[in-house]
Amino acid sequence: MGTQEGWCLLLCLALSGAAETKPHPAERQWRAADVVLDCFLAKDGGHRAALASSEDRARASLVLKQVPVLDDGSLEDFTDFQGGTLAQDDPPIIFEASVDLVQIPQAEALLHADCSGKEVTCEISRYFLQMKGTTVETEAWFMANVQVSGGGPSISMVMKTPRDAKNEALWHPTLNLPLSPQGTVRTAVEFQVMTQTQSLSFLLGSSASLDCGFSMTPGLDLISVEWRLQHKGRGQLVYSWTTGQGQAVRKGATLEPEQLGMARNASLTLPSLTIQDEGTYICQITTSLYRAQQIIQLNIQASPKVRLSLANEALLPTLICNIAGYYPLDVVVTWTREELGGSPAQVSGASFSSLRQSVAGTYSISSSLTAEPGSAGATYTCQVMHISLEEPLGASTQVVPPERRTALGVIFASSLFLLALLFLGLQRRQAPTRVGLLQAERWKTTSCADTQSSHLHEDRTACVSQPS
């Protein structure tokens, strides 16, 4: 068993032993601990780029020295890294990195990853500065990219070897760098960029926050922040911030400038998500000396709507299940049939329509099935499974045999006939009353007209009898 495997085993035993006596969260205290990671060192292929790597890799270890972590009691018997790999035939290259001048917010996730059943991938490569005055023999820079599986964090760190390392007696034969008495390459983390989540899923129309933070040593200046989107071979700028000026290329994209200086937070907010927002986002932070980035995958989802209808009422009726407004494309449609007193059974023979895509980018499809009602009828269910649904979504309808449909039709027609007769009867009952009221109204109108005519005749007579 190697040193790294033994160290992880001891840590897991310590964590399991302290599980039953885990204190209240309020009682947790900060403690400095060494975080040891199994890595690979990408051999220098002569590429002068920010991240130089090749297919050839060598075994390596990364020891983050005395990282502050919250201790819940499980680190009581924890032992820091002691080295001791020089006696091996093929010892890994050990990088000791101090974190005195930067913050590692997700150190706990790195420390407990093995015991939590998560995998940590770590790759170290040379980092080349585009500047003069650096001495390769005594100064070197490395980039360490660390990722935790299962939705864990991802962190990229720029590490620098100290200038006084030239006084060391031991030298690494391939790196041509001085080694400590323990046989390690001593470095210091001067800049790091991290994200808490490497992949996110949001519903269509909602808002998304893409996490991106950084930490740097005093003396470095923040130059720019850039968010870019890569999707289906195309790249585009989403948001940029340079020396105090922010510009949103994607409508509504926001980044809080005050958070850059105070909290070292470069997170991006995207409101009213559309299908076009899906893809790989790159958060790139540039300082006066270093540049690093994080990659975040944003997935857009839209839940389907399911509607089941009866297309015809033939001897063997056809059922149509409409699935509309879903994204992404993959969807599973199953049909089940259940007779009275029986259990649901999956049926085959369904056909599908051509795929349809809306202007918004969502998909729709229809599934048709010829139903067999049987002698007592049956209930058919169209069930849809999609990544946006926590559980399958279904719609059901009951299909009855032809004789029952005929009987039901007769009952329905008879009911309509009886209702019509009842309505006519009520109309006839109300007819005499309405006729009487109408005649009374006519008599009243005639009487008033006769009275007015009489008065008019008297007035005319009076006018004629007056002397001139």
Curated annotation (Swiss-Prot):
Topological domain spans for side Cytoplasmic: 427-468
Pfam families: C1-set, V-set
Subunit description: Interacts with peptide-free HLA-A*02-B2M complexes or those loaded with low affinity peptides, likely facilitating peptide exchange onto higher affinity peptides. Interacts with MR1 in a ligand-independent way; this interaction may stabilize MR1 pool and facilitate ligand loading and dissociation.
Descriptive protein name: Tapasin-related protein
Signal peptide extent: 1-18
Keyword hit for Thylakoid: no
PROSITE patterns with a match to the protein in the record: IG_LIKE, IG_MHC
GO cellular component: endoplasmic reticulum membrane; Golgi membrane; plasma membrane
SUPFAM superfamilies named in the record: Immunoglobulin
Residues carrying a glycan: N265
Lumenal domain ranges by topology: 19-405
Localization: Cell membrane; Endoplasmic reticulum membrane; Microsome membrane; Golgi apparatus membrane
Membrane topology listed for this record: Single-pass type I membrane protein
